[in-house]
A protein has these predicted regions:
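Alpha-helical coupling/stalk and coiled-coil linker elements that connect catalytic or binding modules
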Residues: 1-279
Length: 279
């Protein structure tokens, strides 16, 4: 078909725009001349053409991702694809702008600035994000203090308990002190009878054994509550932050869609240049 012959686009977005152009040919002479000027520029500057096609190829199908964002159905890895795609915007603007081609400059001047959104996405999303919420880390470290602490507790609980144990040994001077757990009253500090006189006043005695006493502290009770509900709370926090992130993307949809149209335009015209060179 004619589309198959002419399609040298580097992205699905460009391929869709090409089909639209072929099904509804433009009749405006000025628009045709503008398109031709851009095509001729890339025919004459083949290094720029190859670089542009590579960049556009790396963008992927931003239109599809944005449509999912608008519906609130965008998945975490699609957010990362969106970020990777948008990150090509500035290099493309630098590559194509200031070349002395009025039509090209006009296209580039209409592109929106993605820097703020890119910075936000990069700061908020985990660099190796899970495929969906609840299946691993989605939100980056450093975004939410409670989330960071809960992750540390959930994944390094034993290390944390050893830290508490060592700290209390040093503080009280009780070398045999150890931390344990049972289903009756949770985490406890166990002290042998020979050292029970060294127990701090704020410790609460919970159980007396033949040779030892067991105590609880406010710190251990707080830790217990955190670790037992850590995964559930981690999920809740990530859901909340991710919803805010999706809302941020949705607030920028108009700008992203405009950029997609311009990138599609460049994709089609660079494809025409590629076709002209090879034929």
């Amino acid at each position: 078909s004619l589309v198959e012959v002419m399609d040298r686009c580097s992205s699905p977005m460009g391929a869709r725009m090409l089909r639209t152009w072929l099904s509804m040919p433009v009749m405006d002479l000025q628009e045709l001349e503008s398109r031709y000027a851009v095509v001729q520029h890339f025919i004459d500057n083949r290094d720029d053409l190859m670089r542009l096609q590579t960049m556009i190829g790396d963008i992927g199908d931003l239109e599809r991702i944005i449509s999912r964002a608008a519906a609130g159905k965008i998945m975490p890895r699609e957010v990362m694809q969106l970020r990777r795609g948008l990150s090509q915007t500035e290099p493309i603007m630098k590559l194509c702008g200031g070349k002395g081609v009025e039509a090209l400059d006009e296209l580039i001047s209409k592109m929106g600035d993605c820097a703020e959104l890119l910075e936000y996405l990069g700061r908020t999303m985990h660099p190796e994000t899970a495929s969906q919420l609840g299946k691993g880390d989605v939100i980056a470290a450093g975004v939410n203090e409670e989330l960071d602490e809960l992750r540390r507790i959930a994944r390094h609980g034993k290390d944390y308990l050893l830290e508490v144990q060592q700290r209390e040994i040093e503080r009280t001077g009780i070398p045999s002190l150890k931390i344990g757990f049972n289903n009756v009253f949770g985490y406890y500090l166990e002290v042998r009878n020979t050292h029970k006189e060294s127990v701090p006043e704020e410790w609460i005695r919970k159980q007396t054994l033949v040779n030892a006493e067991r105590y609880i502290t406010e710190e251990l009770k707080e830790y217990e509550q955190k670790i037992l509900g850590a995964e559930e709370r981690i999920y809740a926090i990530e859901v909340q932050i991710y919803a805010e992130l999706v809302a941020k993307i949705q607030a920028n949809i108009a700008m992203i869609q405009k950029n997609c149209r311009i990138l599609s335009h460049l994709d089609v015209l660079s494809g025409f240049a590629d076709l002209a060179i090879s034929n």
